[in-house]
Amino acid sequence: MLNSLDLEGRPQDTRVVVAMSGGVDSSATAALLKAQGYDVVGITLQLYDHGEAIHRKGACCAGQDIHDARAVAERIGIPHYVLDYESRFRESVIDSFADSYASGETPVPCIECNRSVKFRDLLATARELGASALATGHYVSSRRLDDGSRALVCAADRDRDQSYFLFATTREQLQFLRFPLGDMTKPQTRELARQFGLSVADKHDSQDICFVPTGRYTDVVERLKPNAMEPGDIVDVDGRVLGQHPGIVHFTVGQRRGLGIASRSPLYVLRLDAAQRQVVVGPREALLMDRIVLRDINWIGDGSLDDVIGDGLELFVRVRSTRAPQPAWLRAANGGYEVELVVGEEGVSPGQACVFYDAAEGQARVLGGGFIKSAAPRRFEGGREQIEAPALAAARG
């Protein structure tokens, strides 16, 4: 008989490691599982020292979070451990974050953290502790399929859904992971924390990248990749120099404000050329992208991707975490994979993720995704970049 976590055995005979960040979500997760009778072990990861990250002395800014997690563990009566993962977090997340910005991309460090630190390293630690599952406070869910495997699905609360950040989760990891908050809303989670008497019930959510609490990610990049701060030219789509910039790291695709150049019509950042140290700008219509080339694909749908893709696979994709899934086609091309959007998306930036879903609404299943390598813009009047996805061009006649 399966317990509430879809695991064999009674809760009291089932050890579950909970990744405790010190926030209300993971704290409520730990308290809920403890109340259900599971053998819960809380683990908090010390991932970085903020002072070191920006090259100045100072205490770890995550100290309060560790204190809060420890206080919650004491309150609900579970063992709690703090593990030093700083070196692996720097290698897997911070260094790649700086490399990505220096190459003209806009990275999503939370995806890499989930993929390489939490769901690889911490999951391995949980197994070593004899756990049957690793539970987190993510707003996402999973369900058992007929063959015994598990599917990753969107949270019931779409405003809180974090599936975009978990697309790189593997099938093997999904078998071991559990997400108890997947069917709850944030207000329900806070109320649950109050019922358990947790001190973090009203703790504010973090709004910044965890290792950049000041919001100035350029401080981290400048420390690790000073070449990214070298000045260069701001040019239009025809290559005409319109002005200079202090470093491509200060810009992202779709940006309009802060360009430092005068123009009779609004200009937007279209792309960043790290090799030439150029910021390419143009009209808003040039931001519309139809075709996206992907790298590092992770497929967690049914079967193997090569077997199911055929001449093209119809699905829905999100190119930013804050955007709704849009209809698209996934195709094999040039030894890799491309996405053709039915309707163009603005500001598709290399380094961001393109996540696949089987539906646009409800608790859709996550089919996987990949990182955006490049994108081709929709045809627009003016400029040289009049490129159109071949399939869409044929459809339009």
UniProtKB/Swiss-Prot annotation:
Catalytic class of the enzyme: transferase
Reactions that this protein is recorded to catalyse: S-sulfanyl-L-cysteinyl-[protein] + uridine(34) in tRNA + AH2 + ATP = 2-thiouridine(34) in tRNA + L-cysteinyl-[protein] + A + AMP + diphosphate + H(+)
Binding residues annotated for ATP, in chain numbering: 19-26, 45, 137
EC number: 2.8.1.13
Organism the protein comes from: Rhodopseudomonas palustris (strain ATCC BAA-98 / CGA009)
Record-linked InterPro entries: MnmA-like, MnmA-like_C, MnmA-like_central, MnmA-like_central_sf, Rossmann-like_a/b/a_fold
Region (Interaction with tRNA) residue spans: 160-162
Keyword hit for Nuclease: no
Family: Belongs to the MnmA/TRMU family.
UniProt-listed Gene3D superfamilies: Adenine nucleotide alpha hydrolases-like domains, HUPs, Translation factors
Protein name (database record): tRNA-specific 2-thiouridylase MnmA
Domain of life (superkingdom): Bacteria
Example of a GO cellular component annotation carried by this entry: cytoplasm
GO biological process, one term: tRNA wobble position uridine thiolation
Pfam families membership: tRNA_Me_trans (PF03054), tRNA_Me_trans_C (PF20258), tRNA_Me_trans_M (PF20259)
Active site: 113 (nucleophile), 210 (cysteine persulfide intermediate)
